[in-house]
C-alpha cells in the first residue's frame, strides 16, 4: 500500500470531524492485515471525557467489522506541525498491532514521516503481561 493513499483517506476523514469545542480536527486511516482500510475522525462531546480521537474511531470501526490486526495507520491533524497520537491512542494502536506497525504522521500527502510503533510507544503494555 502506498502511504499517500492512506494519507489521502485520513485527510478526507479529517474534514468530517465534529469539533465544536477545540476546533482541532484530526483524521485517521487504518490499514488492516486483511487489506481493508477504515477511516475515522475525532468526535468531541460537551462532557470532554466522552470525546473520541480519530485513531480510536478508525480502529474501533475496524474491530467492530471483524478485523483484529492492523498493519499501518495514517494520522493527519490540523496543525502546521506533525500531530502525534495521544497516549491512549498509542496504547490502542499497540493492542491491535505489532511493534512494527507503521505510524504515518502527515501534514499532507507529500509531507509526512513514518515511525514504527516501537518508536512512539517503547515498552508497550501488552496482553502477555496479563498472562493472555
Regions found by a protein language model. Name each.
Residues 36-37:
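Hydrophobic "anchor" residues
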Residues 61-65:
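Active-site- and interface-proximal helix/loop "cap" or "latch" segments in soluble metabolic
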Amino acid at each position: 500500500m502506498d502511504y499517500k493513499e492512506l494519507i489521502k483517506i485520513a485527510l478526507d476523514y479529517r474534514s468530517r470531524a465534529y469539533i465544536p469545542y477545540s476546533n482541532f480536527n484530526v483524521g485517521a486511516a487504518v490499514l488492516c492485515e486483511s487489506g481493508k482500510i477504515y477511516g475515522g475522525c475525532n468526535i468531541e462531546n460537551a462532557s470532554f471525557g466522552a470525546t473520541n480521537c480519530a485513531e480510536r474511531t478508525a480502529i474501533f470501526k475496524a474491530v467492530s467489522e471483524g478485523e483484529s490486526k492492523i498493519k499501518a495507520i495514517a494520522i493527519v491533524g490540523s496543525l502546521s506541525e506533525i500531530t502525534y497520537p495521544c497516549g491512549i491512542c498509542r496504547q490502542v494502536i499497540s493492542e491491535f498491532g505489532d511493534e512494527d506497525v507503521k505510524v504515518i504522521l502527515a501534514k499532507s500527502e507529500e509531507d509526512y514521516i513514518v515511525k514504527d510503533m516501537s518508536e512512539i510507544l517503547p515498552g508497550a503494555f501488552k496482553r502477555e503481561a496479563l498472562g493472555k
